[in-house]
Amino acid sequence: MTKTVAIANRKGGVGKTATAHALGAGLIRKGYRVLFIDLDSQCNLTDALGIESGSVEASSLDVLEGSSEASEAILQTEGGDLLPATPQLATADKLIEGVGAEYRLRDALQPIARRYDYIIIDTPPALGVLTVNALTASNKVIIPAQADLYSLTGIEQLYGTIGAVQHFTNKKLKIDGILITRYAGRSIISKDMRGNLEEVAQIIGSKVYSTPIRECIAIREAQATHTDIYSYSKKSNASKDYEAFIEEFLGG
Protein backbone atom coordinates (compact mmCIF):
# COMPACT_ATOMS: atom_id res chain seq x y z
CA MET A 1 0.00 0.00 0.00
CA THR A 2 1.30 3.43 -0.93
CA LYS A 3 2.29 5.65 1.98
CA THR A 4 1.94 9.37 1.43
CA VAL A 5 3.98 11.66 3.68
CA ALA A 6 3.62 15.43 3.96
CA ILE A 7 6.59 17.46 5.19
CA ALA A 8 5.06 20.52 6.82
CA ASN A 9 5.62 23.46 9.12
CA ARG A 10 4.09 26.93 9.15
CA LYS A 11 7.56 28.41 9.63
CA GLY A 12 9.94 28.77 6.71
CA GLY A 13 13.65 27.98 6.79
CA VAL A 14 13.33 24.87 8.94
CA GLY A 15 14.54 22.37 6.36
CA LYS A 16 11.29 21.13 4.82
CA THR A 17 12.73 20.78 1.33
CA ALA A 18 16.02 19.31 2.55
CA THR A 19 14.07 16.77 4.60
CA ALA A 20 11.70 15.89 1.76
CA HIS A 21 14.64 15.40 -0.61
CA ALA A 22 16.75 13.43 1.87
CA LEU A 23 13.84 11.21 2.91
CA GLY A 24 12.85 10.41 -0.65
CA ALA A 25 16.42 9.88 -1.84
CA GLY A 26 17.18 7.68 1.14
CA LEU A 27 14.11 5.54 0.47
CA ILE A 28 15.09 5.20 -3.19
CA ARG A 29 18.54 4.00 -2.12
CA LYS A 30 16.79 1.28 -0.13
CA GLY A 31 14.90 0.12 -3.20
CA TYR A 32 11.56 1.84 -2.64
CA ARG A 33 9.63 3.47 -5.48
CA VAL A 34 9.23 7.15 -4.65
CA LEU A 35 7.31 10.09 -6.10
CA PHE A 36 8.25 13.62 -5.03
CA ILE A 37 5.56 16.31 -5.10
CA ASP A 38 6.53 19.98 -4.89
CA LEU A 39 3.71 22.28 -3.72
CA ASP A 40 5.90 25.26 -2.81
CA SER A 41 5.93 28.25 -5.16
CA GLN A 42 9.63 28.71 -4.36
CA CYS A 43 10.18 25.48 -6.36
CA ASN A 44 13.18 24.47 -4.25
CA LEU A 45 12.54 20.73 -4.44
CA THR A 46 11.97 20.98 -8.17
CA ASP A 47 15.28 22.81 -8.50
CA ALA A 48 17.08 20.34 -6.22
CA LEU A 49 16.04 17.55 -8.57
CA GLY A 50 17.55 19.40 -11.52
CA ILE A 51 14.38 20.77 -13.11
CA GLU A 52 13.98 24.41 -14.15
CA SER A 53 10.49 25.33 -12.97
CA GLY A 54 9.97 27.75 -15.85
CA SER A 55 10.49 24.99 -18.40
CA VAL A 56 7.88 22.47 -17.25
CA GLU A 57 4.87 21.87 -19.48
CA ALA A 58 2.62 20.86 -16.58
CA SER A 59 2.98 21.36 -12.84
CA SER A 60 1.36 20.43 -9.55
CA LEU A 61 -0.81 23.54 -9.95
CA ASP A 62 -2.14 22.27 -13.28
CA VAL A 63 -3.01 18.98 -11.60
CA LEU A 64 -4.80 20.76 -8.76
CA GLU A 65 -6.71 22.94 -11.22
CA GLY A 66 -7.72 19.86 -13.20
CA SER A 67 -6.12 20.99 -16.47
CA SER A 68 -3.61 18.12 -16.41
CA GLU A 69 -3.60 14.54 -15.18
CA ALA A 70 -0.93 13.62 -12.63
CA SER A 71 0.42 10.96 -15.00
CA GLU A 72 0.97 13.64 -17.67
CA ALA A 73 2.71 16.07 -15.33
CA ILE A 74 5.12 13.69 -13.58
CA LEU A 75 8.73 14.03 -14.73
CA GLN A 76 11.40 11.36 -14.50
CA THR A 77 14.60 12.87 -13.10
CA GLU A 78 17.91 11.33 -12.15
CA GLY A 79 16.87 11.73 -8.53
CA GLY A 80 13.41 10.20 -8.84
CA ASP A 81 9.95 10.88 -10.24
CA LEU A 82 8.71 14.41 -9.62
CA LEU A 83 5.45 16.31 -9.85
CA PRO A 84 7.09 19.74 -10.23
CA ALA A 85 6.16 23.12 -8.83
CA THR A 86 5.65 26.45 -10.54
CA PRO A 87 5.96 29.99 -9.14
CA GLN A 88 2.26 30.43 -9.96
CA LEU A 89 1.47 28.25 -6.92
CA ALA A 90 1.73 31.52 -4.99
CA THR A 91 -1.78 32.32 -6.26
CA ALA A 92 -3.24 28.89 -5.44
CA ASP A 93 -5.56 30.15 -2.71
CA LYS A 94 -7.37 32.25 -5.32
CA LEU A 95 -7.29 29.64 -8.08
CA ILE A 96 -8.26 26.54 -6.12
CA GLU A 97 -11.53 27.07 -4.33
CA GLY A 98 -15.10 25.86 -4.17
CA VAL A 99 -16.71 22.60 -3.14
CA GLY A 100 -14.21 19.79 -2.61
CA ALA A 101 -11.12 21.95 -3.10
CA GLU A 102 -9.37 20.16 -0.22
CA TYR A 103 -9.60 16.79 -1.99
CA ARG A 104 -8.13 17.69 -5.35
CA LEU A 105 -4.63 16.34 -4.75
CA ARG A 106 -5.90 13.16 -3.11
CA ASP A 107 -8.25 12.48 -6.00
CA ALA A 108 -5.61 13.30 -8.62
CA LEU A 109 -3.15 10.84 -7.09
CA GLN A 110 -5.52 7.88 -6.90
CA PRO A 111 -4.95 6.66 -10.50
CA ILE A 112 -1.14 6.62 -10.14
CA ALA A 113 -0.53 5.95 -6.44
CA ARG A 114 0.00 2.21 -6.88
CA ARG A 115 3.11 2.86 -8.95
CA TYR A 116 4.89 4.03 -5.80
CA ASP A 117 5.74 2.79 -2.34
CA TYR A 118 6.09 6.34 -1.00
CA ILE A 119 4.82 9.74 -2.09
CA ILE A 120 6.72 12.59 -0.42
CA ILE A 121 5.07 16.04 -0.46
CA ASP A 122 7.02 19.24 0.13
CA THR A 123 4.62 21.93 1.36
CA PRO A 124 4.84 25.74 1.44
CA PRO A 125 5.43 27.70 4.67
CA ALA A 126 1.73 28.54 4.90
CA LEU A 127 -1.50 26.91 6.04
CA GLY A 128 -3.63 27.58 2.98
CA VAL A 129 -5.23 25.34 0.38
CA LEU A 130 -1.94 23.73 -0.71
CA THR A 131 -0.98 22.50 2.75
CA VAL A 132 -4.56 21.38 3.41
CA ASN A 133 -4.50 19.41 0.15
CA ALA A 134 -1.20 17.80 1.15
CA LEU A 135 -2.51 16.82 4.58
CA THR A 136 -5.78 15.53 3.16
CA ALA A 137 -3.87 13.31 0.72
CA SER A 138 -1.39 11.97 3.29
CA ASN A 139 -1.19 9.11 5.75
CA LYS A 140 1.50 10.81 7.81
CA VAL A 141 2.97 14.23 8.42
CA ILE A 142 6.55 14.92 9.49
CA ILE A 143 7.22 18.29 11.11
CA PRO A 144 10.77 19.62 10.66
CA ALA A 145 11.61 22.19 13.32
CA GLN A 146 14.62 24.09 14.55
CA ALA A 147 15.28 24.12 18.26
CA ASP A 148 14.07 27.69 18.67
CA LEU A 149 11.04 29.59 19.94
CA TYR A 150 9.68 30.45 16.51
CA SER A 151 9.48 26.80 15.51
CA LEU A 152 7.35 26.11 18.58
CA THR A 153 4.89 28.75 17.39
CA GLY A 154 4.88 27.27 13.89
CA ILE A 155 4.11 23.81 15.26
CA GLU A 156 1.23 25.13 17.35
CA GLN A 157 -0.28 26.82 14.30
CA LEU A 158 0.21 23.72 12.13
CA TYR A 159 -1.32 21.50 14.80
CA GLY A 160 -4.54 23.51 14.61
CA THR A 161 -4.72 22.89 10.87
CA ILE A 162 -3.88 19.20 11.28
CA GLY A 163 -6.68 18.88 13.82
CA ALA A 164 -9.16 20.45 11.41
CA VAL A 165 -8.03 18.13 8.61
CA GLN A 166 -8.32 15.09 10.88
CA HIS A 167 -11.85 16.14 11.81
CA PHE A 168 -13.19 17.15 8.42
CA THR A 169 -11.20 15.65 5.51
CA ASN A 170 -8.77 12.93 6.62
CA LYS A 171 -9.45 11.06 9.85
CA LYS A 172 -6.52 8.70 9.18
CA LEU A 173 -3.84 11.41 9.16
CA LYS A 174 -1.16 10.81 11.78
CA ILE A 175 1.62 13.07 13.04
CA ASP A 176 4.58 10.73 12.67
CA GLY A 177 6.99 12.97 14.54
CA ILE A 178 8.92 16.21 14.95
CA LEU A 179 12.35 16.21 13.30
CA ILE A 180 14.84 18.66 14.78
CA THR A 181 16.86 20.29 11.99
CA ARG A 182 19.84 22.66 11.81
CA TYR A 183 20.77 21.46 15.27
CA ALA A 184 23.70 22.95 17.19
CA GLY A 185 24.20 20.33 19.88
CA ARG A 186 26.69 22.35 21.91
CA SER A 187 24.35 25.30 22.25
CA ILE A 188 22.62 25.61 25.61
CA ILE A 189 19.63 27.20 23.87
CA SER A 190 19.34 24.27 21.45
CA LYS A 191 19.43 21.77 24.30
CA ASP A 192 16.78 23.67 26.26
CA MET A 193 14.54 24.08 23.21
CA ARG A 194 14.86 20.39 22.40
CA GLY A 195 13.29 19.71 25.77
CA ASN A 196 10.49 22.13 24.91
CA LEU A 197 9.91 20.37 21.58
CA GLU A 198 9.63 17.05 23.39
CA GLU A 199 6.98 18.56 25.65
CA VAL A 200 5.08 19.83 22.62
CA ALA A 201 5.32 16.39 21.01
CA GLN A 202 3.67 14.84 24.05
CA ILE A 203 0.88 17.41 23.94
CA ILE A 204 0.11 16.68 20.27
CA GLY A 205 0.36 12.93 20.78
CA SER A 206 3.54 12.40 18.82
CA LYS A 207 7.29 12.19 19.36
CA VAL A 208 10.57 13.88 18.61
CA TYR A 209 12.76 11.67 16.43
CA SER A 210 15.77 10.57 18.43
CA THR A 211 18.33 11.76 15.86
CA PRO A 212 18.43 15.52 15.20
CA ILE A 213 19.81 16.75 11.88
CA ARG A 214 22.93 18.72 12.65
CA GLU A 215 23.67 22.05 10.98
CA CYS A 216 25.79 21.17 7.94
CA ILE A 217 26.98 23.21 4.97
CA ALA A 218 26.85 20.08 2.81
CA ILE A 219 23.05 20.32 2.71
CA ARG A 220 23.10 23.68 0.93
CA GLU A 221 25.99 22.61 -1.29
CA ALA A 222 24.12 19.47 -2.35
CA GLN A 223 21.04 21.53 -3.21
CA ALA A 224 23.14 23.94 -5.25
CA THR A 225 24.54 21.07 -7.31
CA HIS A 226 21.13 19.38 -7.75
CA THR A 227 22.36 16.33 -5.87
CA ASP A 228 20.99 14.43 -2.89
CA ILE A 229 22.98 14.64 0.32
CA TYR A 230 24.13 11.00 0.19
CA SER A 231 25.58 11.28 -3.30
CA TYR A 232 27.16 14.64 -2.56
CA SER A 233 28.78 13.85 0.77
CA LYS A 234 28.23 10.35 2.13
CA LYS A 235 30.42 11.03 5.18
CA SER A 236 28.88 14.37 6.15
CA ASN A 237 27.03 14.79 9.43
CA ALA A 238 23.81 15.51 7.56
CA SER A 239 24.07 12.32 5.52
CA LYS A 240 24.65 10.23 8.63
CA ASP A 241 21.85 11.98 10.52
CA TYR A 242 19.29 11.59 7.75
CA GLU A 243 20.19 7.92 7.34
CA ALA A 244 19.57 7.38 11.06
CA PHE A 245 16.30 9.31 10.85
CA ILE A 246 15.10 7.16 7.94
CA GLU A 247 15.82 3.98 9.88
CA GLU A 248 13.72 5.34 12.74
CA PHE A 249 10.98 6.43 10.32
CA LEU A 250 10.80 2.99 8.74
CA GLY A 251 10.84 1.29 12.11
CA GLY A 252 8.03 3.42 13.48
Q: What is the predicted function of each stretch?
A:
Residues 1-252:
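P-loop NTP-binding core
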